[in-house]
Every structure is written in structure tokens, then in C-alpha cells.
């Protein structure tokens, strides 16, 4: 998605879970699902990666259980990241989070950045002790896919 549908809720949950166990309220999952379905997403890209086959898994047969599971998870991540399409918002968040202009011009315009900054500004309405931490978590939701996708290519 160009716009993460529950980005504010996700950021707040992660923020709260840093200092206390986050306990979901009754019906919160259903509310998140409905919000995710009905909320504006902007551009949407759907990719189906190649199926993980028995032959793929055989490469890890000699590994003990936990290592086997880790390697299968890495394989799944590689498949997902290979088909992931990054959006301008991912690159904007990455540049803001790390104080750079690495992707400006190539991956996003000033207009796109202004739109993202307007969206980001809405975080100010949340009364939290460490707003900079909440902002970093929020930016991470959008910027982490950049790191994940670039790691697979390097």
C-alpha cells in the first residue's frame, strides 16, 4: 500500500508496548481489520511470489528445529521482499528518519513529501511522553521496507 491503513494505531501500539504489555481491547482486532479494508490505501500493488516447494525446504533438512525455522523464515522474507514494490512514502520516511536526502528527486517529489509531512503532522494530536519516539516508530513502519528490500540486493 502507498498508505498503511492503520499506521497511527500500529505506531501507538508499538509505542505503548515498549514500557508495558500491550493488551488489546475487546473487538480491537475486528476494528483494525475493518479499518484496514475500508481505509484509503492510495496505490496498491499485489504480487504473488513463487511457492516454497518441498525441494526448497530440503536444503534445510540437516538443521536442528530452531535453525530450520529461522532459515525457512528467511526464505519467506526473501520471496516477499523480491516482489515488494516500494512507494514514494517509503523513501520519504527513510530520508526523514535518517536525516538524509538520499532518495529525493529519484524516488519522490517535493509535492509527495509535503503530502507525507501533512500525514505525519497528525501524530501531534497524540499525547505521549516521548513524541520523538512515537515519530520514529511511525517512520519505521514506512521506512523499514526500504532497508529490507535493499538488504536483499546487497
List each language-model region with its residue ranges.
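Membrane-interfacial terminal anchoring regions of lipid-handling membrane enzymes
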Residues: 1-154
